Design a protein with these regions (language model features):
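Periplasmic polypeptide-binding modules associated with outer-membrane biogenesis and secretion
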Residues: 1-176
Length: 176
C-alpha cells in the first residue's frame, strides 16, 4: 500500500502578461482582440489549463484566418515559487496568409459546374480555411446527390500563398 500526500502550496498570482502577434497577421483585428483580451490577467491566480486553452484559441483563430504557419516564437510562463508570482509571455508569429486559388470539381459530369459551386463555402482568392472546406463537404454530403464527397487541398502545392483545392464527387445512384 502506498500513501502519497501532496502539498500543492500557494497559488501563483500573475504579475505580468505580454501577448503579442507578429507577422502579416499582426493587423488582423480579431487576432489583436484575442491577444489584448487574453483571459488570464494581472492579479489573477495562474490556472494552467486556462492558459493552454487561451493559447490554443489564439493560434487556432490565426489558422482559421488563413495563417497556416502560425506558431509561437515564445510561449512561456515564468513562475517565481518564492514570490508566488508568474509572468506570461506569448509571441505568436503568424507567417504569411494563405488563400484559395483554383477549385477543381471532378466526378460529377451530369451536374453543371455553376450548380456544384453553389455548395462551396469558399471561393478562389478568399482566405484559406479548413473550416470552410469542411462546411463545403458537409453541404455536398447533405445534398444527398453524392455517395462520396472529398474536399481537399494540399498546402505543399501552394504557389505565392495560394492553395489549389479539389472536390472529388461520386454520384449517388439515381432514384426514380
Amino acid at each position: 500500500r502506498l500513501r502519497v500526500q501532496i502539498d500543492p502550496g500557494q497559488p501563483a498570482v500573475i504579475t505580468g502578461v505580454n501577448v503579442t502577434v507578429t507577422g502579416s497577421g499582426a493587423s488582423e483585428a480579431t487576432l489583436a482582440a484575442l491577444a489584448s483580451d487574453f483571459p488570464l490577467r494581472k492579479g489573477a491566480v495562474l490556472v494552467h489549463p486556462l492558459y493552454e486553452k487561451a493559447k490554443q484559441a489564439l493560434q487556432s483563430r490565426a489558422e482559421e484566418l488563413g495563417y497556416l504557419d502560425a506558431a509561437y516564437a515564445v510561449h512561456e510562463v515564468r513562475v517565481d515559487e518564492a514570490g508566488r508570482s508568474a509572468v506570461i509571455t506569448l509571441a505568436l508569429e503568424t507567417g504569411q496568409k494563405y488563400f484559395f486559388s483554383t477549385v477543381a470539381i471532378k466526378g460529377a459530369p451530369d451536374y453543371p459546374d455553376a450548380f456544384l459551386r453553389r455548395y462551396l463555402a469558399f471561393q478562389p482568392e478568399e482566405a484559406f480555411s479548413y473550416g470552410r472546406m469542411a462546411a463545403s463537404q458537409l453541404q455536398l454530403n447533405n445534398s444527398e446527390r453524392f455517395r462520396r464527397v472529398i474536399v481537399r487541398a494540399d498546402k505543399e502545392q501552394a504557389r505565392d500563398g495560394k492553395i489549389p483545392a479539389q472536390v472529388i464527387l461520386t454520384p449517388a445512384p439515381h432514384i426514380r
